[in-house]
Amino acid sequence: YLYIETHINAYYNPSLASSADAVKTVVSNNINAYADSSEMNKYGARFKYSRFQAIVDNSNQSITSNITKVEIRRDLKPALNQNAEYELCFGNPFYIRNNNGYNIKSSGFNIFGIADTVYLSDVPNNNSKNSKYGSLFLFKLQARQDPIVISANVGTIDYEKGEILIKPINIIGTSKKVQKISIIE
């Protein structure tokens, strides 16, 4: 599954709404109805950002605009304790926010031979926002915001196609579990 997570800031005219909670409730209800609709839950369905924003804007006459941040993710169920390669296809382009990397990030996991929890991230080739491709690397956190690269070139990323290819890696554990199954987000 492709998971879509949104962070919405809806702006509204308070004189046209009974309360902020009323606006929040109707926006939430409309988003949930859209998420549950056949438009979003059929094979080959596409998330349309402009359609989503229109649903938010049209939820209540008091809403004047919205700024919505969208994040997409896939849950990877790794083959534990064995070398395996992975391909994750998102079907949506990745935005290069930072030429120096860290545009995508995984949840934590453990690999054979490294005692620390590691994370997967990227760096665009040529350090350019116009780059179509990038490489993947593993890093650990020395402190809360102090990443240290553990291993470079562990895979590739195609920013235009939204595809991630991870070279053979021996994952021995993950920081996240869903119904007792180890996953990497």
Regions found by a protein language model. Name each.
Residues 62-64, 73-122, 126-130, 172, ...:
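Polar low-complexity, Ser/Thr/Gly/Ala/Asp/Asn-rich disordered segments used for subunit assembly
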Residues 15-19, 28, 37-38, 50, ...:
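Generic serine detector
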Residues 132-133, 140-185:
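Surface-exposed interaction regions enriched in Ser/Thr/Asp/Glu
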Residues 1-87, 160:
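Acidic, low-complexity glycine/serine/threonine-rich segments
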